[in-house]
Amino acid sequence: MTNEEMLQRVNELALHLEKEERDLYHDCVANGFHHIPGFAGALASLTVTLRDDIADDEARKSGRGSAQAAAKRIIKNAFAVQKIRENLHGAWMENGKQCLCDGFHAVILDSAIPGLPQVDDDLKKVNLAPILTPARKNDGMKLTLPTVGELKAAIKIHDAKERAQKKKAKDRKPLIWEFGEDLPWVNGNYLLDLLELLPGCTATASSYAPDYNAIYFQAEGIGEGILMPIRKQSGKTDS
């Protein structure tokens, strides 16, 4: 059994604790406490240990992040959410650069990633350059980005908690990554795609309505991209 599967089982057990014990459990987990007496304390200690192990595992793996896998995830999502827009159902070349977009995040790569599905030659290609132009002018906060390992670990921990609640796959919510007070929130899975496609990138929020306007990502010599934030006030996601 993997650490993620064990964490899911522990989360399931925690759901059945009495309220007082459940509150103790959540308090211990939030503060990283170990060795608290009682069943709730033991569960919390196990949860903290498993989370630490997952984070360590992902930190070790982070150097092998696959840009190709991230690109394929964008294409797969384009198939799912942009069913009638066949000109997004693959990668395409524009001015010698490779483009990917699903409507929520988009990337322009200086060098093409091999082995990706391609948009049919007969279809009119989307010109991403004008779409990225407003974001290139972003002059808001430079966002502090997580490492690939940190983000992967956070996603695994979040997903284990979602599965523990026995939700159907379509009802599970993605991890929301919060950059800070008065700063954008984003879909953690989409953020991971950009970090793997644009290693070492910087990210700049818009100074005007950062909760609505695209975040601009740039990695010198690799490419650039944008990510649409999540609408905070309604709880509705744009991504």
Residue ranges and their predicted role:
Residues 1-13:
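Short, charge/polar-rich alpha-helical segments
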Residues 4-6, 39-65:
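Flexible loop/turn and low-complexity linker elements, especially glycine-anchored beta turns
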Residues 5, 66-74, 150, 190:
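Exposed alpha-helical structural elements
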Residues 15-52:
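Short interaction-hotspot residues at assembly and binding interfaces
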Residues 31-32, 90, 96, 222:
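Intrinsic-disorder/low-complexity loop/linker signature
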Residues 52-109:
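Intrinsically disordered, low-complexity linker/loop segments enriched in Gly/Pro
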Residues 102-105, 109-113, 117-239:
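C-terminal functional regions that serve as terminal interaction/effector modules
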